[in-house]
């Protein structure tokens, strides 16, 4: 992160922004939680850390004393904190488990809607989140509906397969069933700054995927075999949980579908809107007037079923995304539909 911030400052300076003043008063008012500032490891760039407040059940649709919990899952699914200015700094995997645990403790909650808007994420993070939802259903017997928003691809869709029912919006992008590992060769870029790497290693393949050189044939074969195994696991999970899906290679080649196409192929059970998911959950609970609540932090208010938590640092949004620069901060193999090589949805 420090390298990216420094790069951003240099980029801004060389672009002639020295005469422009950046006002921060509005940014401070947007910070979603109480924060304090510390120095980063090199003692130069500040980091903003938020104080974790307990999750609260915030009503987004009024009703009876019986509740339906709407759990929001947005953005890149990785097992790490997305900390920085303007971000709640949540770990998506940790937060998802925390919300499921709170739902399980609340005896007034009778059903769960998982609202997913995600390109996907790390192979392991996505798999863990799905397993957590499967375990939750096994322990509680509670009905679960997944509603896909703008994007329900890769690991985001993998998570949805753990639900009793999947609903997609008419314009949802569904699919991206595949595995990707992004590697970049920065040898020429480093040479422009007179930087050269010198690696001392014990083990022929221990530096496989290094940005300092291209892969050889053996290395490419090793990584491809791993990707294919992860992809086969993804396919097996879909086929086991979606009985109407046919084992057709054409639909498992990473392509994407509209909500209607996904329904025709059996990847989703219906096409509708979030109100339709709520109505279905109410039917499952036997209470057509059940209250709908979202679990958010005290400083992160939810007033409608569309409420989202800011979980991407403002500084990252202000900087150019350079392929390869984020590689060390992300998982390796990913269940993700990736239209952008920077992997920052």
Where are these regions (language model features)?
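N-terminal organellar transit peptides
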Residues: 2-4, 9-146, 151-152, 158, ...
């Amino acid at each position: 992160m420090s390298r990216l911030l420094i790069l951003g400052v240099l980029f801004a300076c060389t672009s002639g922004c020295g005469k422009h003043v950046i006002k921060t008063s509005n940014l401070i008012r947007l910070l979603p939680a109480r924060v304090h500032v510390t120095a980063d490891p090199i003692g130069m760039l500040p980091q903003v850390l938020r104080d974790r407040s307990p999750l609260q059940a915030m009503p987004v649709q009024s009703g009876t004393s019986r509740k339906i919990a709407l759990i929001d899952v947005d953005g890149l699914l990785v097992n790490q904190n997305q900390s920085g200015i303007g971000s709640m700094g949540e770990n998506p995997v940790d937060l998802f488990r925390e919300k499921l645990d709170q739902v399980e403790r609340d005896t007034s909650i009778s059903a769960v809607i998982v609202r997913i808007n995600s390109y996907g994420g790390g192979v392991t993070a996505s798999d863990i989140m799905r397993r957590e939802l499967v375990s939750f259903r096994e322990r509680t017997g509670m009905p679960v509906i997944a509603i896909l928003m703008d994007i329900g691809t890769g690991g985001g869709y993998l998570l949805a397969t753990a639900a009793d029912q999947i609903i997609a919006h008419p314009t949802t992008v569904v699919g991206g069933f595949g595995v990707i590992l992004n590697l970049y060769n920065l040898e020429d870029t480093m040479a422009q700054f007179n930087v050269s790497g010198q690696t001392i290693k014990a083990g022929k393949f221990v530096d496989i995927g290094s940005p300092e050189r291209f892969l050889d044939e053996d290395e490419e074969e090793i990584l491809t075999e791993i990707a294919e195994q992860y992809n086969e696991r993804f396919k097996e999970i879909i086929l086991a949980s979606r009985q109407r899906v046919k084992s057709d290679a054409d639909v498992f080649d990473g392509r994407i579908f509209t909500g209607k196409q996904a329904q025709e192929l059996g990847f989703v059970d219906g096409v509708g809107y979030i109100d339709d998911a709520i109505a279905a959950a109410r039917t499952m609970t036997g209470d057509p007037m059940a209250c709908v609540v979202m679990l958010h932090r005290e400083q992160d208010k939810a007033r409608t079923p569309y409420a989202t938590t800011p979980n991407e640092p403002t500084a990252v949004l202000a900087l150019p995304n350079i392929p390869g620069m984020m590689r060390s901060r992300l998982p390796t193999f990913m269940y993700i539909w990736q239209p952008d090589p920077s992997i920052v949805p």
